[in-house]
């Protein structure tokens, strides 16, 4: 897995999208999550899809953090009260040629008073 963002304390992530810029060759799915769940945000984005394809915008593509099936999120988001977590991206197989992907993170910052 590759760390793509050190998530600051006081962050709420409401959505993560992966957009294919340059398709990879071979086979492989990209997953996006954090230190606790490697596909908590995006379950499986086809790394060989056409340029411009977006993943994480459909119900079948989002992980448990957005679907609210895990106790660590409230509503349809994940809260990070403390620092020390990273947003991570991984590929489930080795591609012959790597894909180029933009990752877009949507959310809020807050001051935790806990």
Where would I find each of the regions flagged by the language model?
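Surface-exposed, low-hydrophobicity beta-strand/loop segments enriched in small/polar/acidic residues
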Residues: 1-114
């Amino acid at each position: 897995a590759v760390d793509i963002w050190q998530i600051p304390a006081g962050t709420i992530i409401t959505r993560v999208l992966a957009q294919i810029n340059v398709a990879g060759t071979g086979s492989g799915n990209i997953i996006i999550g954090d230190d606790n769940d490697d596909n908590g945000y995006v379950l499986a984005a086809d790394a060989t899809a056409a340029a411009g394809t977006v993943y994480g915008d459909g119900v079948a593509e989002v992980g448990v953090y957005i679907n609210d099936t895990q106790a660590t999120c409230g509503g349809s988001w994940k809260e990070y009260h403390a620092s020390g977590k990273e947003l991570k991206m991984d590929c489930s197989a080795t591609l012959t040629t790597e894909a180029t992907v933009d990752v877009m993170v949507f959310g809020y910052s807050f001051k935790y008073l806990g």
